[in-house]
Amino acid sequence: MAKKVQAYVKLQVAAGMANPSPPVGPALGQQGVNIMEFCKAFNAKTESIEKGLPIPVVITVYSDRSFTFVTKTPPAAVLLKKAAGIKSGSGVPNKDKVGKVTSAQVREIAETKAADMTGSDVEAMMRSIEGTAHSMGLVVEG
């Protein structure tokens, strides 16, 4: 018989840096999950990813307090900021441009995010990433 799902918990946790402090501890603690077990499993799964990069994770908590989790790719905005070498996007993206990214960088980000995005092809995903770049005040060259 299949386990009964008690809850889905969505978090963004830094790769390789999960620990029982907020936001992980309170979110999982109220579901009755063994927090250290999750932290060890998450850190082991994300050890190949650049340390500190925020990784979205969906944790499925079952009624017997066991859990499974699925990691996603980092948000497009984070990857764009890293590619452009900036700390944050523009507060007024239509007026103030804060950096530049090339089409090659946009393609690389689109290919990285391909598993999580619903676009039909790489070109459609690239347009989506370009839209995110424009809304952050980045100029796409090429």
UniProtKB/Swiss-Prot annotation:
PROSITE patterns: RIBOSOMAL_L11. One of its GO terms (biological process) is translation. Pfam families: Ribosomal_L11 (PF00298), Ribosomal_L11_N (PF03946). InterPro entries: Ribosomal_uL11 (IPR000911), Ribosomal_uL11_bac-typ (IPR006519), Ribosomal_uL11_C (IPR020783), Ribosomal_uL11_C_sf (IPR036769), Ribosomal_uL11_CS (IPR020785), Ribosomal_uL11_N (IPR020784), Ribosomal_uL11_N_sf (IPR036796). One of its GO terms (molecular function) is large ribosomal subunit rRNA binding. SMART domains: RL11. Keywords: Methylation, Ribonucleoprotein, Ribosomal protein, RNA-binding, rRNA-binding. One of its GO terms (cellular component) is cytosolic large ribosomal subunit. One or more lysine residues are methylated. Forms part of the ribosomal stalk which helps the ribosome interact with GTP-bound translation factors. Belongs to the universal ribosomal protein uL11 family. Part of the ribosomal stalk of the 50S ribosomal subunit. Interacts with L10 and the large rRNA to form the base of the stalk. L10 forms an elongated spine to which L12 dimers bind in a sequential fashion forming a multimeric L10(L12)X complex. This is Large ribosomal subunit protein uL11. It comes from Yersinia pestis bv. Antiqua (strain Angola). The gene is rplK.
